[in-house]
Amino acid sequence: MIAFRGVSKVYTAGGREVAALRNVSLRVEAGEIHGVLGQSGAGKSTLIRCANLLERPTEGSVSVDGQDLLALSPEALRKARQGIGMIFQHFNLFGSKTVAANVAYPLEVAGTPREAIRERVEELLSLVGLSDKAQAYPSQLSGGQKQRVGIARALAPRPRVLLSDEATSALDPETTRSVLGLLRDINQKLGVTLLLITHQMDVVKAICDSVSVLERGRLVEQGKVTELLAHPSTRLHQLCFPAFAAPTDAPSGRRVALTLAGEHARRPLLGTLARQFDVDALLVEGAMERVGNTRVGRLLVDLQGSADAVSQALAYLREQGLTLEEAANG
């Protein structure tokens, strides 16, 4: 478990103070994948560097597995950091070392016996699919392979927590999907808690259980990804589903915006309106997104039928728990 409580970070630049983080409090539960989403300058990198005290907060506290890192002695902090692995955006591999030697490095620093290092390196290279690259050098690897080495190295000391600093932003879409799939597998197989920062909504949708949205150093919302996306008023929903374009034609019925999530996104709700209420639903605009193993969608529809029938159809949709907003006619 990771907990930030009232964390602020202020830098001094050019004789003035710049606040990178402003009173941020968030909690990442043990074993989950938590994303921190925000654009450049939002404070994401500062936050993740506070998670292992590469940056010390100006105010607030940071706890990992119940330990207040700021209260630890230098020796105790070094020991605590062994349980926190980090994956970097630009890999940070030693160019003069082989893949196996890069993975072995943190174990050598920790004084691990040579035979135990060899066994652990073999195990990790198998886990990340690079057993055949043990004696290769970073210059001989693709970007995705380099990141897999970085992941293996981060896992070498058997950390309970992995921090991912924009780990896929330098990769092409196909490689990104592959690396995200590997991170999800590691989370499920090893039970490692993963805190990742990203500016890419696709990363959040692909593997995150929960998410925090940062803007200008402030936490604007946090929660389960599917729950936030299911509510049009949330910032995450607005980032994922931009506002519908202004209609160029008058509605041909009562125009309604529907948000579908989970079971609702798999059911023929619009067909049900036609069969059960004699109401036709004309799709004006819409989008459907896959979020982990579920789907979330937002549709703009015109409901056509008698006034009573349309009212009954709307009542039915509300009874089903759908979020809907009715647009003004004309």
Curated annotation (Swiss-Prot):
Compartments where found: Cell inner membrane
Q: Which GO terms describe its molecular function?
A: ABC-type D-methionine transporter activity; ATP binding; ATP hydrolysis activity
Topology within the bilayer: Peripheral membrane protein
Residues forming the ABC transporter domain are 2-241
Q: Give the UniProt family note.
A: Belongs to the ABC transporter superfamily. Methionine importer (TC 3.A.1.24) family.
Q: How does it assemble?
A: The complex is composed of two ATP-binding proteins (MetN), two transmembrane proteins (MetI) and a solute-binding protein (MetQ).
Annotated protein name in UniProt:
Methionine import ATP-binding protein MetN
